[in-house]
Amino acid sequence: MNVFKVFCLMVLLGWQLPAMAERIKDVSMVEGVRSNQLVGYGLVVGLPGTGEQSRFTEQSFKGMLNSFGITLPASLKPKIKNVAAVAVHAELPPFRKPGQTIDITVSSIGSAGSLRGGTLLQTFLKGVDGNVYAIGQGSLIVGGLGAEGLDGSKVVINTPTVGRIPNGATVERAVKSPFMQNDYITFNLNRPDFTTAKRLEKTINDLVGPNSAQALDAASIRVIAPRDASQRVSYLSTLENLEFTPADTAAKIIVNSRTGTIVIGKNVKLQPAAITHGGLTVTIAEQLNVSQPNAFSDGDTVVTQQSIIDIKQDDSRAFVFNPGVSLDDLVRAINEVGAAPGDLMAILEALKEAGAINGQLVVI
């Protein structure tokens, strides 16, 4: 009895893993099973006067007419306010076959005011290798709206220069997948972790058999798989639905210095530390005074400058962190002193420099 038959028998007998776990498919992806980016250049026509008359749009328009056997004089500059040059891009999902359709996004690359009401003409979508994998065409769905008055006033809602065409491109060429090329498949963890990799390896080995899975590093787990296509699909279908318990995430504090957003992981702990944080406000005002002499005197008008400096210090409070303080205690203590997000970022950075944070402080 081969490995695959034993594997199927064990599944039918009712293999169960602990609840409160994650499926393999939710924390990893199969190596080689990926989407591919496509991009193309095309023209959108039928715009209600919101197109453009740039040089490259004019050239593209003439090239399109030439492809239909219509030749315009070189000196002629057509008025094409209802045409816009656009970039078209799409994601080609794995295993998508010729004849199937994919969604495409159309974006203006010139000075067009809006793509609302326009239609994309036949556009070749190419991959990074230069081959055409899909052809796009169709009427755009544009969520934005723009309007401009004769006096130059303008109102723009959302983004009228970007639109989508659901199922707007037909796949012409399939991307070859390495899914069936080897005697094994490889799961790559979305978040590499040595503990998670070993737990996933053990979960598969406990089900399929010893040495069926091998953790190669913190991200990749190689699993022996049947060569037969039908068996491999069934085998992978069962494997990716197995449940196991991943390792806890690393203790991290994520700080976005631009927006003031702060995310603190549940595993963040603090060493003993005392903190005091007060606000010091310095205000400097400059005032010009004019000294005007009396009439019929020999004095000169003099301008003097007076500086007024005011310093205000807010009351500050000190608080102490005991060993092993958790996220809840940290947030509660920070809120008690009324710290703003900017103050909190300064406090966290100071704690990290003092070695009081058991975890990573990541500033993005």
Curated annotation (Swiss-Prot):
Source organism superkingdom: Bacteria
What lineage is this protein's organism placed in?
Bacteria, Pseudomonadati, Pseudomonadota, Gammaproteobacteria, Alteromonadales
* The UniProt record lists the keyword 4Fe-4S: no
The scientific name of the source species is Pseudoalteromonas translucida (strain TAC 125)
Entry keyword set: Bacterial flagellum, Periplasm, Signal
How is this protein named in the record?
Flagellar P-ring protein
Q: Which residues form the signal peptide?
A: 1-21
The Gene Ontology CC terms held by the record are: bacterial-type flagellum basal body, distal rod, P ring; outer membrane-bounded periplasmic space
Which family, according to the similarity comment? Belongs to the FlgI family.
One Gene Ontology biological process: bacterial-type flagellum-dependent cell motility
